[in-house]
From Swiss-Prot:
Keywords assigned: Cytoplasm, DNA-binding, Transcription, Transcription regulation
Transmembrane segments: none
Originating species: Pseudomonas syringae pv. tomato (strain ATCC BAA-871 / DC3000)
Protein name: Probable transcriptional regulatory protein PSPTO_3980
Cited Gene3D superfamilies: 1.10.10.200, 3.30.70.980
Gene Ontology MF: a single term: DNA binding
């Protein structure tokens, strides 16, 4: 499963851009609201809300802002309904792209996503057109310096799918979608505190890009991520390190 680290360069680039754009608060406010609406306002009994709460606190969101988002989700405050919608399509070079959104106006969001695909030389597809190329997984990440052997042993005992050690020494533990929270809790109980933990869409196949195509694909990803309603963008693009270095 070491191949999953191929997409780390795009992910890290995305995280830097999220912070730069100041979009991260909006993203987690929406996730808090939807998580609370679906599973209730108690993070102790709502694992999705607990994960969103951890992310929001990690982004230095104030407790007051968090509480308002949760209250909106459980119906304690007024506000337009926010729903989760997914979009699928192909970008330049035949790269498969999945877009996760949260929106209070599906027509606005669909039009904006379609425009991004069209402008960047891609095509917005129908439901299922590229979803079969991805698996929904849990990814629990640990910073370099953690005891690798002990972490691997604890992860396997917790029924994790695999453990990947990256070039920088950080370690990713991958889980099934359904087993994500149980594995995360088991690792915490064993004394391993994650640097990050999230549900992701991992590609089962990859499209290796040259410099020209990589520029076009990243332009599409940037344009999609700039949309206010977009939460996450996943692709099966594999950009070799030497190409990523040329991109800067």
């Amino acid at each position: 499963m070491a191949g999953h680290s191929k997409w780390a360069n795009i992910k890290h680039r995305k995280e830097r851009q999220d912070a730069k754009k100041g979009k991260i608060f909006t993203k987690w406010i929406r996730e808090l609201t939807v998580a609370a609406r679906q599973g209730g306002g108690d993070p102790g009994s709502n694992p999705r809300l607990r994960l969103a709460l951890d992310k929001a606190l990690g982004a230095n969101m104030t407790r007051d802002t968090i509480d308002r988002a949760v209250a909106r989700g459980v119906g304690a405050s007024d506000g337009d309904d926010v729903e989760e919608l997914g979009y699928e399509g192909y970008g330049p070079g035949g790269v498969a792209v999945m877009v996760e959104t949260m929106t209070d106006n599906r027509n606005r969001t669909a039009a904006a996503v379609r425009h991004a695909f069209t402008k960047c030389g891609g095509n917005l597809g129908t439901d299922g057109s590229v979803a079969y190329l991805f698996d929904r997984k849990g990814q629990i990440s640990f910073a370099a310096g953690v005891d690798e052997d002990s972490l691997i042993e604890a992860a396997m005992e917790a029924d994790a799918d695999d453990v990947v050690t990256n070039d920088d020494g950080s370690i990713d533990v991958f889980t099934s979608f359904s087993g994500f929270y149980a594995v995360r809790n088991a690792l915490e109980a064993a004394g391993f505190m994650a640097a990050d933990a999230e549900i992701v869409m991992l590609p089962t196949t990859s499209a290796v890009l040259d410099l020209e195509t990589a520029e076009k694909v990243l332009k599409l990803i940037d344009m999609l991520e700039d949309l206010d309603d977009v939460q996450n963008v996943y692709s099966n693009a594999e950009i070799p390190d030497e190409v990523m270095e040329q991109l800067g």
